[in-house]
Design a protein with these regions (language model features):
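Short, flexible loop/turn segments with low-complexity composition
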Residues: 207-209
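Nucleotide and nucleotide-moiety/phosphate-recognizing core
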Residues: 3-160, 168-184, 191-192, 198-205
């Protein structure tokens, strides 16, 4: 476990899968659901994991995982982050940071968690996102809970919806990750994406993931 247990892991699993036509979390890639791929990567690296979802989530019961509803269904990922922060406060948790992971991106490398730990020690920003191949990955980030009030205000009163717009307003810093032969941040939105992911699983991982 992390020696400095001040980060809560949050899996944002709330997005309605309009393009997929079914609940993406339960789609199988190899012998695991997309959500299980993500959970198996992070479960041993965090003391506690929160899943934010606007529909029921079917996972094997694990003692360090809590599932909560998205308190603003359909307002996008910012609302999921806010739901997590509010839960954290209401339950008097001591975590100072929230690390977010999307539930539809099974190939990310767990080394990013070490990067988060390094960055939050610097304390030169309240928000960091991963950047790879010149692309910012707005759902792979670590957020200070000091942002709660402002996030709530901007979401409810100022109609912020896009993660990027809000992050730019806050002054996000990026964590640059070396590019790989394939994109570890490839996310699955469509049935075509799922076929691509199956290829990646075979070619890069020999189905071992």
């Amino acid at each position: 476990f992390m020696e400095d247990n001040n980060i809560l892991a949050v899996v944002l699993a709330g997005g309605k899968s309009k393009r997929f036509g079914q609940d993406k979390n339960q789609i199988k890639l190899g012998d695991k659901t997309l959500l299980d791929h993500v959970l198996s990567k992070i479960s041993s690296r965090f003391e506690e994991i929160l899943i934010v979802s606007s529909h029921s989530v079917d996972i094997k019961k694990m003692k360090n995982i809590t599932i909560i509803p998205d308190c603003f269904d359909d307002l996008g990922p910012l609302a999921g982050v806010l739901s997590a922060m509010k839960w954290l406060k209401e339950n008097h948790k001591r975590y100072q940071w929230v690390a977010t992971f999307p539930s539809d991106t099974p190939f990310f490398e767990t080394s990013i968690i070490e990067e988060y730990k390094k960055k939050i020690k610097l304390k030169d920003s309240l928000l960091y996102f991963i950047k790879s191949n010149n692309k910012k990955h707005n759902i792979f980030g670590v957020w200070s809970i000091e942002l709660l009030k402002q996030l709530e205000d901007d979401l409810i009163n100022n109609n912020f919806r896009k993660v990027e717009d809000w992050a730019n307003k806050i002054g996000v810093k990026t964590i640059d990750i070396e590019p790989k032969k394939f994109d570890p941040f490839f996310n699955i939105n469509t049935k075509e994406d799922l076929e691509k992911a199956k290829k990646i699983l075979k070619e890069k991982y020999n189905d071992q993931i």
